[in-house]
Design a protein with these regions (language model features):
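A short helix->beta-strand "capping" segment at the edge of beta-propeller domains
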Residues: 39-62, 219-226
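Non-catalytic accessory segments flanking enzyme active sites
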Residues: 64-68, 73-90, 100-104, 108-109, ...
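Short coil/turn segments that connect the beta-strands within blades of beta-propeller domains
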Residues: 74, 120-122, 164-166, 243-245, ...
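Beta-propeller domains
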Residues: 188-194, 199-324
Length: 699
């Protein structure tokens, strides 16, 4: 009995020890897990008020100054709220003295001659059910000017009064050949309605365009013969050519690889080409920096922007189409036209020869004498925008940097003398000063082969360069826009600052193909296929960043982007899983051939002419490469990158047995902001995903 009791005692002791060991083991496992969960909760608690301030309360939203110059350049008007008025009223300011005068009129006055009111102010054009009508403001009589039948999918728009007020030019758009697609209309969830909308997909029919002229008293339309019967084309501009008998039309080929400026003589019924250019890639891209032309010398000559020598430059041509001179020689790009001041003999333009992330004002003599010179004062980095008065004496000058909100000044030319400050954005400026402990770093990444890419990096305020940090890459990477710009940009920049404070390095890189002012070869490097080049250069840029900055942890890399950036996120996750571990793709287009013709065909033509380019550009074809954690976010009400384009990828990933996360916001469009709380919810959802799969903080 005694031996048996001892054995039972030993068994109980062993059992107790086993339980204690098991408890210790469970506690050891639970402790780190609990710590991780608490850390995530703490991070969410920290960032949510900041994001709420960004997306719901507008705490970091800077005010923009919007003034309209008076025709005589003596001053400007600003719509302001005044006591006793429910709506904003125009307030006039004298440019020289600053004297303020409140007008009795409401809203902004539209300039005469462009669309609405006639040059003499006595007639008004309006658009109704696809047709143009004219109302006599004196007697109230209405005249119908165009006769398209309702339901024909034909619209007559973009009306332009002739200088003498006797004719109206307009553009007719015929969408009847464009295929219809069905879209669910929000309503009864059991019996939703469907509406039909036309969508010009890659390779399909596009709108048929015509330019017409009709007498202001009514009558038959005179159509300009600017195309062959079955020719597809777009119009860059259509306007009166400085008189009431000639029209200027900028005609762009379907693939935007050719453009012609046509001068139509209405009385003679003749059309002649005064400028023409072509390029195997494109001549006018979606960002349209070199579109249109400007008449000078009373219409005897014109200024046009072209990239025909490899740089975006200004040229002077005679009205007959003879080139007179290259106005802006040199290895630099014009970013955009600003002002032609013929009285003083200057052409003003934006450029930044030494830094593709910034923008300054330059000028060059119209007669070709001298070299381009910088007008923006030295020592003021960032982005500078200018809006001139008609006579060129007064200017609204707005400048900002990535970390400082815009300030608008009234400046007097030619000396760039500051007269007064019109908008300081003092509230936001003070808020940013209290938040920003470290300035955003702009840097250059040399990946070899002569390719040097601009990038920015946002680090947490308690950044310790002796440790390693996870990286979140923000990507766009397509030809429509740059992300690396030294200018105030909300709300993305504010979001990235908030995310960085959690313990991430937020990085963005502009690869070749983005519209940086670095020459035509840089921008056209992606011609034929959007996706492959950007994916490789983004990855190589990240490696170069880590090579030069040892605190970059390449074992913890996330990437996110919206629209084209969403597509590049998918390509990164599918094609470079060795580099990227977590991705968030918002509103992507993983099947390029299903996107709209107006954008995609500029850069890739169609599948019929470029099948391999479309195969390489479509992320769906590389989905088997997914190894990391992927979140796809989309709006079911998309009118840009339709939901079906993404659902095809969802089906493919399911077929491949790939695990991923997918979030759709009902009835939201491309911006995914409709509905109360949507923007905040989306951003918090992204943050949760990062915290779960790419834990922040140094190691």
């Amino acid at each position: 009995m005694r031996d048996r009791a001892e054995n039972v005692s030993i068994m109980k002791t062993n059992l107790t020890l086993a339980c204690v060991v098991a408890a210790w083991s469970t506690a050891a496992v639970a402790a780190p897990e609990n710590s991780i969960q608490e850390s995530r909760k703490s991070a969410l608690k920290k960032i949510e008020p900041r994001l709420r301030g960004i997306y719901e309360q507008g705490e970091y939203r800077a005010r923009g100054f919007r003034g309209d110059w008076l025709p005589d350049s003596s001053g400007y008007t600003v719509v302001e709220r005044v006591p006793g008025q429910r709506h904003g009223v125009p307030v006039r300011y004298d440019a020289a003295s600053g004297k303020r005068t409140v007008s009795e009129r409401r809203g902004r006055e539209r300039p005469r001659g462009f669309g609405g009111r006639s040059p003499d102010g006595r007639k008004m054009l309006f658009h109704e059910r696809g047709n143009l009508h004219l109302r006599d403001l004196d007697g109230g009589r209405t005249t119908q000017l165009t006769r398209s039948r309702p339901g024909e999918s034909v619209s007559n728009g973009q009306p332009m009064w002739s200088p003498d007020g006797k004719r109206v030019a307009f553009v007719q758009s015929d969408h009847s050949k464009i295929r219809l697609r069905s879209v669910l209309v929000p309503g009864d969830p059991s019996y939703p309605r469907v509406r039909q909308t036309r969508f010009a997909r890659v390779g399909g029919d596009i709108a048929k365009l015509k330019v017409g002229v009709v007498d202001a008293a009514g009558g038959e339309t005179q159509w300009l013969q600017i195309s062959e019967p079955d020719e597809d084309f777009y119009l860059g501009m259509a306007e009166w050519a400085g008189n009431s008998n000639e029209l200027l039309v900028e005609k762009l080929s379907r693939f935007r690889d050719k453009r012609d400026f046509l001068l139509a003589d209405l009385e003679a019924g003749s059309i002649k080409t005064i400028f023409s250019e072509s390029d195997p890639a494109w001549v006018v891209a979606s960002y349209r920096k070199n579109a249109g032309l400007e008449w000078i010398r009373d219409g005897r000559a014109f200024l046009v922007i072209s990239e025909k020598d490899g740089w975006r430059h200004a040229y002077i041509y005679s009205r007959e189409g003879k080139e007179e001179r290259l106005l802006t020689p040199g290895a630099f790009d014009i970013i955009e036209k600003v002002k032609i001041d013929e009285k003083r003999g200057w052409f003003y333009f934006n450029a930044s020869p030494d830094n593709g992330t910034q923008k300054y004002l330059y000028r060059v003599a119209l007669d070709g004498s001298g070299k381009p010179e910088r007008v923006t004062p030295e020592g003021r980095p960032g982005t500078h925008n200018y809006s001139f008065s008609p006579d060129g004496r007064w200017v609204f000058h707005t400048y900002s940097t990535f970390d400082s909100p815009p300030v608008t000044e009234l400046v007097e030319f030619p000396g760039h003398r500051v007269v007064r400050t019109l908008e300081k954005n003092e509230r936001v400026s003070q808020k940013m000063k209290s938040l920003l402990k470290r300035p955003t770093e702009f840097l250059k990444l040399d990946i070899g082969g002569g390719v040097v890419m601009d990038a920015f990096m946002i680090a947490p305020s308690d950044f310790d360069p002796s440790k390693k940090y996870p990286v979140l890459v923000y990507v766009y990477g397509e030809p429509h826009a740059q992300t690396v710009l030294d200018r105030w940009a909300t709300p993305h920049a504010d979001y990235h600052r908030a995310v960085a404070e959690l313990g991430y390095l937020v990085v963005s890189i502009d690869n070749r193909g983005t519209p940086a002012p670095k020459g035509a070869a840089w921008r056209r490097a992606v011609a034929g296929s959007l996706g492959p080049l950007s994916t490789e250069e983004q990855a190589e840029g990240l490696k170069e960043l880590a090579r030069t900055r040892p605190y970059v942890d390449l074992s913890r890399v996330g990437i996110w982007g919206w629209s084209g950036g969403g597509s590049n996120t998918l390509n990164a996750m599918f094609r470079r899983p060795d580099v990227y571990h977590v991705g968030v793709a918002v509103a992507p287009k993983p099947q390029a051939h299903l996107y709209n013709a107006g954008f995609q065909e500029i850069y890739m033509e169609t599948r019929e002419t470029n099948a391999e380019g479309y195969r390489k550009a479509s992320a769906i074809n590389f989905a088997e490469g997914l190894k990391g954690e992927l979140l796809i976010i989309h709006g079911s009400g998309e009118t840009n990158t339709h939901l079906e384009i993404v659902e095809g990828l969802v089906d493919r990933l399911v077929e491949l047995g790939k695990q991923f996360d997918y979030m759709t916001y009902p009835n939201r469009d491309h911006g995914i902001h409709e509905g109360r709380g949507t923007s905040l919810h989306l951003r918090m959802h992204m943050v949760r995903y990062l915290l779960n799969h790419l834990p922040p903080g140094p190691r």
